[in-house]
Amino acid sequence: VKKILAVADTGKKNAALAEISRALIENSDKIIEANQKDLAAARENGMSVSMQDRLMLNEDRIKGIASAVDELIKLEDPIGKVDNGSVRPNGMRITKIRVPMGVIGMIYESRPNVTADAATLCLKTGNAVILRGGKEAYNSNKCICEIMRDAVEKAGFPKDIIQFVDDTTREVTTELMKCDKYLDLLIPRGGAGLIKAVTKNA
């Protein structure tokens, strides 16, 4: 799967991103419905108003997420770009060329917009992604991920270039941190506690 994405040209990747943007807007009602489940659970569990605001998605915020994807399409494709080069004394020229990492794992907390941000950034750079969001945004994250998986398939990519960890337990998260055989890079996005846990277990 990662090889298919790694060799995909800019046009195909941008077409998939455009499909994701369109699908997010088209399915905004579905996303909001899933998000309402997360908000109801958050209120029940006594989540602070400020944290609930981070968690909340409405039509305008979904439009903002889709707009960010549209902006990503406009950016230059970094893959294949030559950063610099040098000529060795024997005449051999050595250059640094940007290539995809492979499979990137993302562990993040309660902001559901990160699900779309992470997946689309990975797609633009030719990387497959495994997403593990916070349990507070489980329904929102899962819904957004399913929409994106369908969108990339419609654009001609395998669904599995975007994967979602369905289990939000700490044990599974810790296991993901240790998957160095399958992950080429692990990125934590969150508070000090998350960063510390990743540093300890990765």
Kindly label every feature range from the protein language model:
Residues 74, 83-202:
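Rossmann-like NAD(P) dinucleotide-binding subdomain of oxidoreductase/dehydrogenase enzymes
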Residues 1-94:
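N-terminal Rossmann-like NAD(P)+-binding subdomain of aldehyde/semialdehyde dehydrogenases
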